[in-house]
Structure formats: structure tokens, C-alpha cells
Amino acid sequence: MNTRKTYIGIIAGLGLMAAGCTSMDITPKDQGNSASWYSTEVELQLAVNEFYILGYWNRPLESSEQWTDNTTYRQQNRAAGSGGSVLDGTMTGSMWEVYSLWQQDYKLISRANTLLENIHRAEENGVNPAAIKRFKAEAYFARACKYAELLFFFGDLPYMDKYMTISEAEAIGRKPKEEIIPLVYDDFDEAIDGLPVSWGAEHAHPTKGAAMAMKARFALYMGDWEIAAKAAKDCMDLNVYSLASDYGSVFLQSTGVIPEKVFAIPRSIENSVTLDEWFVKNGLPRNAGGYGSYNPSWDLLAAYLCTDGLPIDESPLFNPQKPFENRDPRCTATIVEFGTEHVGFIYDPSPAATKVLNTKTGAMQSNNDSRAVAQYASFNGLVWRKGIDQSWVDNFPKVAPDYIIMRYADVLLMYAEAKIELNEIDDSVLDAINTVRARAYGVKAGDTSLYP
């Protein structure tokens, strides 16, 4: 009986405690929340750090290249999520390629809006005005980039520049594309005004040059040539960017911060932010332990000019029996040339090459990159060299190259394209194009006789 009374007393006490907790409405102190967050510089820094979660920026198979003529995948027109729905025209809004892009972009827009709406708390708490301006600029940058992407893919959009509930967002409908474009330019301008030219050793956050370059890309896509040319030129005139001497090295995981990377999201093996294992496995050739199933297309191979500057169907230098000879060097920096070493083996997809040299052991072994030996070797005989080296094998499956969103080569070529569209072709345009071409051949831009 006494025990029963004790239990009843405990239960009653717990009930009173629960009722008391409910009425007190205590704000949690162990996690960020909209009721108390954005009040200190530390909280603002943590908030903007979340803008650069890789999932907000990358695309399936690391980019939308799978949706172009540049790649092929052996299940491309069969498996959902492999890009086939784009290529065969069966894509709908319910497919992952579509709704994940829409969902992730609006998530980041919502984060940016929430910071901009609540940063007044930090201002009222006396946080350094220079820091406030910088944090705002990062939010404007994120919002501009994501609306720019959504406009490119979808046109008219629901436009939100403040926090909304889902029901409120559903009720506003779509805003015409033409009305949103100027708002995106305004956001980019706010970012340009508030971001630093450099973060010093820190490279995970966007700079003034990144905002200029992303504005130029958006303007180019929208056909606003004057805006694109000016934004690209402004980035060039900062004089903080340059091209790496070796094109192929730019994309390796061993290459860290370099002046060619205008905007990139860093990965880190130590922090478990790595390339998707699917991509690593399918990018490596079969002799190196991969599948060799996500490949460059023959369309891409054919796109590279010959060393005389002519396309393969016009150049007398092109030999269809030796398709890699006399080609722009970026061709073999991107696609593995037959008969050359790649990740420890001589790569030869020929049906006649049933044995291949293992360059690490010096011994001949069964050639799993020939379909005469392995049924599922590369279906078109091509595999990627770009970005892939021995470290992919040594660290498998943990590979962590930066996710590059904007390079200085992009800026130079965007400037040239915009000026050409304006019919304003001058020495600055030729210099921009020649700088990129010359780098491919490993010479100076002024040595025009050494490259086409």
C-alpha cells in the first residue's frame, strides 16, 4: 500500500514538472534556433558556414555533365538517376534530378533569407559593423547564386526574400523571370560590395572576385552581354587570379588553393567530406579496381581541335587510326590516350590486348579494360584522366578534390564571349582567348607561333 502511494506521488510530481516546463517555454541552449540565434559573431559565422555544405552546390555525378553529349554511362537510358531521363526526353518534375535541385536551392535561399532577417540582433548586440557587412554579403551571394541557377533551369519562380512557411510559399505563385533577374543582379552587387578580395589562408568562403565571376556567368546565360562583360572584366582587373601552368594538375586532389580557383567548395578526407564512392568506383578503370563505366563520349573526343587549330573533319593532321595524335593537349589531359600509363597500368581497350603491363610490378597481366576479357569494361573504350591519378587507388574510396565551381579560365572566356556578342572584338578579347589557349600548349600567350 505504501509502495503504491509512493508511485502515485512520483507520477503526480512528474506531471507537475512537465506542466511547469511547458509553461516556462525555455529556449534550448544546446543548439541554434531562430528564437535566439544570429546574436553574436560566432553564431553568424556558424550560420554562414552552413551555406557551403557541399550538397547545396554539387549536382548528380558531381556536375550536370552527365546530361550533356560529353559523357556516356552504360546504364544511361535504363536506370533512374543516371541521366537517361534527360537524354531521352522523359524527365518529369517528380524525378530526383529535378526535385533535388529545386529543393536544395530553396533550402539555401531560406538559410540566406533567415540570416538577413535576423542579423539585426547581432547589430543591436554591438557586433563589429565590418563583420556584419561581410556576413550579409555571404548571404546575398548564396541567394544570388541559387536564384541564378533556378532561373536558368526553370524560368518563372516563386521568389522569396524573407522567411516564409511552406503554406505561405505555396500561395505566392511564380514571379516572372524578367522581374527576378534584376533582383539577382542586385544581390550579386551587394555581395561584391561586402566580400573581401581575399580571405588569406581561408578558402572555403567566396570572395569579391567570385561574386563578380558568378554574376558574369548568370548575365551570360541571360543574354545580358554588357553586364557579363563588365562583371568578368572587373574580376580580371582585381589582378589576383591567374592560370595554373599545367591544365591537368588543376583538377587533382593534391592541388590545393591556387590562383586559378575563383570559387570552389573544399573537400576533406579528415572531415569525411569526400567524392561520392559511386563516382570514384565508376571513374577508375577496371584494372585499377574500378568499373570504368562512367566515360567520356566519342563526341567529346571528336570536339578537341587538331594542333593546326582545325576540327577533325577538316584537318589533314587527324588520323582516325590514332585519334589522340596531333590534338589539342587538353584532349589527352581529359581522356586517357590508348597505350599510355594510367593509375599503374598501360591503358589499352583493344579486343586484341588480352594482356597488359602492370607498371608497378613490371609484369604482364590479364587486361580487364578490354571487353574481350571483361564483359563490362568501358563500352566505348574511353576512360577519364581528368582529375584522376594514383591517389584515387591508394586512398580508395576516399578521394577529396575541391569541387570547383568557377575557374579563372571561365572568367577569361566569358569576357571574350560577351565582347564578341557585343561585336566589340579588340586586343583584350584576343588576349583573353590566347591566354587560355597558350596554357594548354605550355607556352606564353605572346608566342602565337607555338599554338593555333
Model-derived segments and their meaning:
Residues 41-57, 79-154, 169-182, 188-203, ...:
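Conserved, well-structured interaction surfaces
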